[in-house]
């Protein structure tokens, strides 16, 4: 008798896929709420734009391929791709950026490979990286969290800035990015990297308003804790497994601690790494993508650890302040190799 060995994914039950995607969308609510609270209504506008763009792009491709549009859209994967991209970009980024990134993610990074289950790279992170490389200024223009912001635009102002670049009173991104010290604010990771390169001491950097949080950066620590809460709920629901988040966070914390102990004057402390940027979003919502992550338990541990190491290396020595998106995509490349060497041994066969 001959058995055919198929490549992953080994199961593709649409109802099960739809349920898992829905659970992930629900788990994202705390993180979305935190970003709305600290950065204003722009996040919600970006989510709406990305969701509509993702659904339309997927429907268009399915129509061209003469596949069932309604049945495929019900798996909620397009919505999740749009959501992950929307919460990763600055809340007041121009409308066309999130549309461009989402369409690229769905059509090029997902459907071009054959659709859900066939794409080797995380589509949302492909879209994010394309935008970051193409439009670095806009993609790094985050607002200061409301704790240290001079102005937080309301819902109408957020819409006007996203679609026209100005508020009703004539304010632009330069004025909206001002902090309480009158200086344009960046993210904690971006501020740290820029200030170290400018020759500032870590002691000086930690006095900046952006680091006024209890544990890490103002606002960002609570956003990360909110994503952590959603991620723990996913674990409780058994929608994801613990291997990737744990190995990712442990490796990132270990590397950050060792680096900080050996070079405290140039490298960020571990709590800055763990509670800033897209750390918790990446650990629980992006790296755990069942299509692009390793499929064995040992492989998941290696995959998560590799991503954690890459995030620390990029943040500490690379040209970009965060690095989660690049780390995810680089780790995605290694998945076939990891799965090959960590696949379970067939019972009755000798090792090797």
Curated annotation (Swiss-Prot):
Lineage top rank: taxon: Bacteria
A Pfam cross-reference name: NQR2_RnfD_RnfE
EC number, UniProt record: 7.-.-.-
Cell compartments where the protein resides: Cell inner membrane
Enzyme type, top EC level: translocase
An annotated GO BP: electron transport chain
Cofactor entry: FMN
This protein's record includes keyword Cell inner membrane: yes
Annotated Gene Ontology cellular component terms: plasma membrane
UniProt entry keywords in alphabetical sequence: Cell inner membrane, Cell membrane, Electron transport, Flavoprotein, FMN, Membrane, Phosphoprotein, Translocase, Transmembrane, Transmembrane helix, Transport
Chain positions found as FMN phosphoryl threonine: 187
Keyword match Translocase: yes
Membrane-spanning segments: 20-40, 42-62, 78-109, 123-143, 148-168, 214-234, 242-262, 267-287, 301-321, 322-342
Topological type in the membrane: Multi-pass membrane protein
Family (UniProt): Belongs to the NqrB/RnfD family.
Oligomer and partners: The complex is composed of six subunits: RsxA, RsxB, RsxC, RsxD, RsxE and RsxG.
Role according to the record: Part of a membrane-bound complex that couples electron transfer with translocation of ions across the membrane. Required to maintain the reduced state of SoxR.
Protein name from the UniProt record: Ion-translocating oxidoreductase complex subunit D
Species of origin: Escherichia coli (strain 55989 / EAEC)
């Amino acid at each position: 008798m001959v058995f055919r060995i198929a490549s992953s994914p080994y199961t593709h039950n649409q109802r099960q896929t739809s349920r898992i995607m829905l659970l992930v969308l629900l788990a994202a609510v705390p993180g979305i709420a935190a970003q709305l609270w600290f950065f204003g209504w722009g996040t919600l506008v970006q989510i709406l734009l990305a969701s509509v763009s993702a659904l339309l792009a997927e429907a268009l491709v399915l129509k061209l391929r003469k596949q069932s549009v309604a049945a495929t859209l019900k798996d909620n994967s397009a919505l999740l791709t749009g959501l992950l991209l929307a919460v990763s970009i600055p809340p007041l980024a121009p409308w066309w950026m999130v549309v461009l990134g989402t369409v690229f993610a769905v059509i090029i990074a997902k459907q071009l490979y054959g659709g859900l289950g066939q794409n080797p790279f995380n589509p949302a992170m492909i879209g994010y990286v394309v935008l970051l490389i193409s439009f670095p200024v806009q993609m790094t223009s985050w607002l200061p969290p409301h704790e240290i912001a001079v102005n937080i635009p309301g819902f109408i102002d957020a819409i006007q800035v996203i679609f026209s670049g100005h508020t009703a009173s004539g304010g632009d991104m330069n004025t909206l990015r001002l902090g309480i010290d009158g200086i344009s604010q960046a993210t904690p990771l971006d501020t740290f990297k820029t200030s170290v390169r400018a020759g500032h001491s870590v002691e000086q950097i930690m006095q900046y308003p952006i680091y006024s949080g209890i544990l890490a950066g103002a606002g960002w620590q609570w956003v990360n804790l909110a994503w952590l809460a959603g991620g723990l709920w996913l674990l409780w629901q058994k929608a994801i497994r613990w291997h990737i988040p744990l190995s990712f966070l442990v490796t990132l914390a270990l590397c950050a601690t060792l680096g900080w102990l050996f070079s405290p004057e140039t490298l960020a402390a571990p709590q800055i790494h763990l509670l800033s940027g897209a750390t918790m979003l990446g650990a629980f919502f992006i790296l755990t993508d069942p299509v692009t992550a390793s499929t064995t338990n040992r492989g998941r541990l290696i995959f998560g650890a590799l991503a954690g190491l890459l995030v620390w290396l990029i943040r500490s020595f690379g040209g970009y302040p965060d690095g989660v998106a690049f780390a995810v995509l680089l780790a995605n490349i290694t998945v076939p190799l990891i799965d090959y060497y960590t696949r379970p041994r067939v019972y009755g066969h000798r090792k090797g």
